[in-house]
Amino acid sequence: MIVLLTRRIFGLILTLIAVSLLVFAVMALLPGDPAAITLGTSATPETLAALRHEMGLDQPLIIRYGQWLAGALTGDLGKSFTYGVPVAGLIAERLAVTLPLAALAILLSVLVAVPLGAAAAARRGGFFDILATLFSQMGIAVPGFWVGLLLVLLFATSLGWMPAGGFPGWGNGVWPALKSLVLPAVALALPQAAVLTRVTRSAVLDTLHEDFARTAVAKGLSRGRVLWGHVVPNALVPVLTILGLQFTFLVAGAVLIENVFTLPGLGRLAYQALSQRDIIVLQDVVLFFAGLVIVVNFLVDLSYLAIDPRLRAGGAR
Amino acid sequence: MTKFSCPSPSVVARKLAFSAVLSTGLLMIGLTQAEAAKTTLNLGMSVEPTGLDPTIAAPVAIGQVTWQNIFEGLVAIDQNGKIVPQLAKSWEISPDGLAYTFKLRTGVKFHDGQAFDSATAKFTLDRARGGQSVNPQKRFFSTIASIDTPDAETLILHLSSPTGSLLYWLGWPSSVMVGPKSSANDKTAPVGTGPFKFSAWAKGDHVDLVKNPDYWNKSVDVKLEKVTFRFISDPQAEAAALKAGDLDAFPEFAAPELMNSFEGDPRLTTKIGNTELKVVAGMNNTRKPFDDKRVRQALMMALDRKTIIEGAWSGLGTAIGSHYTPNDPGYKDLTGTLPYDAAKAKALLAEAGYPNGFSFTIKTPQMAYAPRSAQVMQAMFADIGVTMNIEPTEFPAKWVQDVFSGRNYDMTIVAHAEPLDIDIYSRDPYYFNYKNPDFNELMKKIQLTADAAEQNKLYGEAQSILAEDVPALFLFVMPKLGVWDKKLKGLWENEPIPSNVLTNVSWED
């Protein structure tokens, strides 16, 4: 078991290093010189050279990669070209927006999808089933950013109940910050909830046909108790798997929603860094996303190991 | 745009009842608040600045937050584009134009307590013109040969050659005065002498400024206590933030097609002013067939500027015949030099040896005005048998690399933001690859005199040369689309220099 774990962790580190090399190579191939962008249309060769030197862009690629990697390993992610502040702090600031947003969206989608999916499965073709089908088809078909625009029009522009966008920061109180995350979380949650409703519905349907469910019915338990007490908890495993996958997707994929609501999240940081060729920030953010996916996969692997003894035996060979 | 129907009457009634109770409860507080005029401002901008030091990076957004609010210069440029004294209260220019003697104000302090004097001014200018300088307008200072500071109040600039635009340039955001102790950190924590102090920067969202209680200029009455610059890049989100009341003002609204959506809003007012943003379609003047003046003239005559403005910017914009705006001193309306005439254009093209036209590629940045203009131009060029392919080119990164630095392009389109930058056609190297000794001579002559009337005459001649020679197709000047609260006073309606000067902004009771 320990050997296996060590091997897995070693593999994880190798993967991260490989990813970092790939990310660095891709950045090096991107057209556009950050120094030239900073100086704009009045750049002269002389000022350009001075700025490139200041930014460290005049160093050979291999040295720049080495410096970046060595820095990243010691927790120093470098300084943003455009903002002039350490990238680690920037990412932390953005996570303080993106993580609560993703968590809120997940929470909302679970609260809607699990009861709706289960109720739909309980009575196929019934009212909730039709509702669930309609909801999930709409949720998948309608783009989240468009929903976001509609929400802004209704709740911010017309009714004035909610801010139209922006983020006051957690320093100005929890409520104002939370308030500015509600509409984007709804917009973000809708497509997720749609997928999750479908997954829940089919998982519950499958579980309903399992032996223990039939046994429970045969024992004379009421339909509701069988469904909510036995079937739904057992059907949650595939639902949780999808949720895990969605979380990484939400953290990385909220760019459009963050743009509609002008939220200073991680997705928008990556987008801005790309257009400004703030290469250091972009490298770090991409590496962070990659690391997130790799670590989540690692945790999933570990949980399989914990569940299935056969894998443990196989791994120790 | 989608409209929502009103809530049902019962909902409205319930809401009204609720708010009646609430407002009665808050009446006392409300009354005491109403007596004091509002002293905060939420101002929107489309682009977030990259750093907050205008002396080390070019993006105009930096100056739009900091210039005149945090940082001040020896001189300033006012609402009408005039040079006015600021940290220098007066100056004298020697008869040969080679020595500028400034008398500086005394008792001026930076926000962190550093004193401003001639040594500080010398430090700032040496930093801007030195070998390590990354000042985006370093060329402004290139003729300063040496700087003398006989006493704390006196600054003397000795020039290697007369520089008639020096005073104007010293009024720019890139020429503001910085403190020796604080300049290294100005990018993230700017320290200036202005009426507002930097307070906080939530990257990706907003910058906060607060009133400087120790501001040196007692003749102005700064009313705002706190200003928040919020950065919103999406036009729909900009409009929503204005209508929802999240923002008090958007001095440079980015979407002309949404301007009329503010009509009928009782709280907001719209103002259409001038900017210095010249939208021009630059051509590679050394590449065939653009090396032939007749071809360039034919292309200019194939374009109906009015239609382009209509298509690209909802009709809001001023047609130009040269690289000059109606704001600028000595402006001449030259749109009649090569007016829209497709038949003449076709004949000229045949004369140049292209009776059947030709085809080329335009590299267009993604900013809304560029692809929209290009599409209208494409149709107009087709009328004279010229095929124009549109190649989207990411701005700034790819555009700077391909067009600006690489000069690997046929035609491009971009809005030039620098005020009074007609001299770019004399710069070598510059992306147009335009070379005209007569024009260069004029640009030199302008620097040899500090006499405004003489300069204006020379600028007039320079405009005429460009209008005739068309190194770039001169299309239009962008309007300054201001949207703000009706009770807000003192924001600039025109923009002789990119800025959001808040010194005289206040709320009407």
Feature names for model-found ranges:
Chain B
Residues 44-95, 126, 191-192:
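N-terminal lobe/hinge region of extracytoplasmic solute-binding protein
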